[in-house]
Amino acid sequence: EALSAAVANGEFITATATVNLGGGNFGDTSEFALNTAATVTNIIVVDTTSDDATGSDTSSIAALYANKGADGKISLREAIIAANNTANIDGSTPDEIHFAIPDALIGGAHTISLASALPSILQAVIIDGSTESDFGSTPVIALDGSGAGGSARGIHLNTGSDGSTIRGLAIHSFGDDGIHIVSDENTIIGNFVGTNASGTVELGNGDDGIHINGGANNVIGGSTATDRNIIAGSTSDGIIVQLSTSDGNAILGNYIGTDVTGTLDFGNGAEGIRLLTGVENTRIGGTAAGEGNLIAFSSGIGISVEGSADSNPILGNVIRSNIGLGIDLARDGVTSNDVGDADPGSNNLQNFPVITSAVTDGSSTITIDGSINTTASTTYRVEFFSSTVADPSAYG
C-alpha cells in the first residue's frame, strides 16, 4: 500500500492493527510491528569499509535494502552496482550514495581497500563522502587502489553518467587514473586525488589524476576551499583533457602538485594540466575570487596547450616551481611573437606582452611599461604576476 506522508530518510516505521467493526466502531488492537527504517528510493547508504559484494541482491536499490547479503552491510561496490541498475527518478534525478560507517577512524579515514576496479558508473549518481558523520573540512572516506590491479581506475564516469557529482573522497594508489570521465556536465569537488585523507601524505595514482576523455561541460573544483580538489603525485599528468568533444570544461580553484597547505612538493610526473589537440573552451582559473588554481612542482610543464586546442582561457592562476614553462603553447618551448599575431596553432599561438620596464617604489606602487603586438581591434585582458625568483627560461 502506498501512503502519502512526510517521512525523513532513516526514520523508523512501525504499525498497529485494530479490528474495524464498522460504523465507526473498533475492537482489539495489536502490539506494535517490528520497525523498519524508511529509505529514500534513490539514496543508498554505505555502512562498511568492506569490498564484499557476495550474496546480496544488487538488482536495484530497493532489492539491495531487502537483501544485503550475509554480512547485513552495504559496501560501496554493492551501492554502485545497485545504482547502475536503478533508473533515475523522472529519468533525470541522480541516485545518491551516502556514507554512515560506524567504525572508528584509522589514520583519519574510513579506508575502503579495493580488491579490483570498482564498476564503471553508467548513469547519473552523486557519491558524497561529506555525508559521513566524521567529515570535517577534509575527506574521511578513502579509496585505496593498491590491491585493485594495475589497470584499475578509482572512479570511472562512463557513457550515460552525465550529471554526476563526486564529492569528498580521497582517491589514491590506483594503477590507472584517479578519476576518468567520458560523460558530460559532471561536478568533481572536494576530493583529494593522490594523497591521504588529510592531504598531508603523497600517495599518487599510476597514470593521470583526473582524465577528461571526451566529456563536455564538466566542472573540476570551484571558488571555495570546500570545493577545491587536490590532485597530486600522479605518474603522468595532474589533469588531462583530450578529444574535440571535450568542450566547455572548467578547472577552478584546485591545488595541483602540492599538499593541503599548498606548500609541499607533491608534484605530478608530467604536466600539471594538459589540453590535447581539439580541446576548446576549457577554462583554467577565472576572474572571480577563488577561481584560480595553484599549479606547482610538475616534472614537466605547468599548463600545456597542444595541437589545435584553442579558445582556452587561462586566468588568475598561481603557476610556480614547475620544471618546464609555466604555460607552453604547442608544447615546444617558448614561441616567439609574430607581427600581427596571424600564426595559427595552440590557443592560436596568442602573442605574449612585451614588458620593457617595471619600476617599483618598494611598497605600494609599480609602474610597468610595455606593449602587445596582436590582432587589431580586439580587446585583451592583461594579467601581471610577480615572483621572488625568475623562471630559468626568463619567461615567467
Residue positions per predicted region:
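N-terminal, post-signal-peptide segments of secreted/periplasmic proteins
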Residues: 1-189, 195-207, 214, 228-233, ...
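Tandem-repeat/low-complexity and Cys-motif detector
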Residues: 183, 209-212, 240-245, 272-276
